[in-house]
């Protein structure tokens, strides 16, 4: 995703703390990040909204995409609440942004509840590119993952 979308000078909005592996991948292409704090309900989307509005009002470029691990955020361990999932999608629509949903823990539910819906399943505008993995439930050593999303984006993932 970083290779496909990031050019020098581009920025990425992401929850902080962020998964170190993702940060390493992004840093190969940019050093500009818009950190968004999180709490027990995940990324604080009202803070993201404030940061995006501030950048837009100042004439600054918006991030190329929003990156989040919505279930079992690594390293924080929190999940994005249903309300914030909806708000995040509203912000992506309002500011014409993509969301990179890195969700290797969707199938690993440690709580006694139904899994939360994926951002992609809630997205009527095809703004979400979803990264999934079998590594957490099947074979951790294989590092087996896949991406799904809008066809016009996923076609660039083909080998």
Language-model features, listed with the residues they occupy:
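Conserved core segment of the aminotransferase class I/II
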Residues: 121-159
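Conserved core of the PLP fold type I
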Residues: 1-95, 106-125
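Glycine-centered flexible beta-alpha turn that most often forms the glycine-rich phosphate-binding loop
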Residues: 102
């Amino acid at each position: 995703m970083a290779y496909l979308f990031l050019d020098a000078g581009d920025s990425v909005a992401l929850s902080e703390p962020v998964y170190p592996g993702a940060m390493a991948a992004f840093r190969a292409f940019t050093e500009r990040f818009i950190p968004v704090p999180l709490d027990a309900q995940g990324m604080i989307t009202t803070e993201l909204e404030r940061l995006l509005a501030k950048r837009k009002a100042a004439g600054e470029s918006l991030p190329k995409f929003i990156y989040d691990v919505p279930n079992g955020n690594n390293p924080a361990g929190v999940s994005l609440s249903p309300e914030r999932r909806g708000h995040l999608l509203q912000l992506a629509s309002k500011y014409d942004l993509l969301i990179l949903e890195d969700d290797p823990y969707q199938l690993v539910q440690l709580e006694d509840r139904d899994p939360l819906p994926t951002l992609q399943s809630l997205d009527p505008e095809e703004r979400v590119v979803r990264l999934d993995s079998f590594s957490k439930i099947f074979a951790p050593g294989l590092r087996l993952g896949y991406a799904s999303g809008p066809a016009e984006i996923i076609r660039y993932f083909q080998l």
